[in-house]
């Protein structure tokens, strides 16, 4: 079995590993993965490690209103109270197109997942029901992962990366932090949003369709995961579920990567990181890539192909399974 080296779970704690690569010119690239759910101290430790190093960081920028919402709504309840009416208002005009899209393009495995979710719906609480409904109404947009992650955080007494790190009043003012990610606010400036949505729902390219289906499967799987957490009363067992689930999923994804299977959800964002690495190593000798752990296998392969070799690693505890404060 292929080993995914960016995560470790010893049965007691879940760790993320920062792998440091160096080339013949002594330029170092620190591949510093981040788990979006963890202890507050975990995120403090990561920031302390980065310090003044040049840092490539991820954060999908949605519309300005969405960004403000994410920074102001610190709990799941606050988030859903604000965002759900907005989803209803914007996506109501596309409900007929969405139904046709689901009927025409859903594959056998997606339909199977939909049936599995429906079977679990009797266990839904109000939050899961709202998140599930919002997914359906909004075409299973990637922004729906955020409330799912908030639900898991609150069910395990853990923090979310976007709450633990101030991406509004702190990070944008750090001159050594370089935002390298999708920016839908800029992309939508010169695009007719209605035309774009209609095109994606009626005549998507094969690449876009595969991306959307992967996204839908990911969200449906996570909805089932929320139900499993709800049915598991002990916080320690929930944390164990998350830790073992992450290890299994990312190891499986890494095996697919080594077999050159494409992953369209991550590919575009990874290519942005790769271009930024090539740009920065021209003028800097110490660079951190601070990105979600799911991206790191592909980025590591790219760095190795650029002539870098492994030098050392640093370990960060994301959370303990049994926590006295949980």
Whereabouts are the PLM-identified features?
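C-terminal soluble interaction/assembly domains
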Residues: 274, 278, 289-291, 298-301, ...
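A short acidic, amphipathic alpha-helical/loop segment
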Residues: 41-49, 276-280, 299-302
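Extended hydrophobic/aromatic segments used for targeting, binding, or gating
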Residues: 285, 300, 305-306, 310-326
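Beta-strand elements within well-structured catalytic alpha/beta cores of enzymes
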Residues: 32, 286-291
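Structured, acidic catalytic/metal-binding patches in enzyme active sites
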Residues: 1-264, 312-323
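Alpha-helix capping/helix-boundary segments
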Residues: 62, 295-296
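A short, acidic, amphipathic alpha-helical segment used as a generic capping/interface helix at domain edges
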Residues: 265-285
């Amino acid at each position: 079995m292929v080993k995914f080296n960016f995560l470790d779970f010893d049965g007691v704690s879940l760790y993320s590993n920062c792998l440091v690569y160096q080339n013949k010119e002594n330029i170092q690239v620190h591949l510093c993965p981040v788990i979006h759910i963890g202890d507050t101290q975990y995120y403090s430790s990561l920031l302390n490690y980065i310090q003044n190093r040049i840092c490539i960081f991820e954060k999908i920028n949605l519309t300005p209103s969405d960004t403000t919402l994410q920074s102001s709504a610190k709990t799941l309840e606050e988030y859903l109270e604000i965002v759900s009416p907005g989803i209803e208002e914007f996506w109501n005009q596309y409900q007929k197109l969405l139904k046709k899209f689901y009927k025409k393009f859903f594959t056998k495995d997606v339909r199977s997942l939909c049936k599995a979710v429906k079977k679990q719906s009797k266990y839904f609480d109000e939050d899961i029901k709202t998140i599930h409904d919002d997914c359906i109404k909004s075409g299973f947009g990637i922004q729906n992962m955020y409330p799912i992650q908030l639900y898991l955080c609150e069910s395990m007494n853990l923090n979310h990366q976007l709450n633990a790190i101030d991406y509004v009043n702190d990070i944008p003012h750090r001159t050594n932090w370089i935002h390298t990610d999708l920016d839908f606010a800029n992309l939508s400036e010169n695009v007719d949003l209605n035309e774009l949505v209609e095109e994606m729902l009626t005549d998507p390219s094969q690449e876009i369709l595969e991306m959307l289906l992967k996204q839908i499967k990911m969200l449906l799987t996570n909805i089932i995961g929320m139900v499993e957490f709800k049915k598991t009363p002990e916080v320690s067992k929930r944390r164990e579920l998350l830790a073992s689930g992450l290890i299994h999923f990312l190891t499986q994804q890494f095996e697919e990567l080594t077999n050159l299977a494409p992953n369209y959800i991550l590919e575009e964002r990874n290519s942005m990181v790769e271009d930024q690495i090539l740009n920065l190593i021209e003028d800097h000798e110490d660079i951190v890539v601070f990105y979600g752990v799911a991206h790191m296998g592909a980025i590591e392969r790219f760095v190795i192909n650029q002539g870098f070799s492994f030098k050392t690693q640093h370990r960060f505890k994301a959370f303990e399974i049994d926590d006295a404060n949980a």
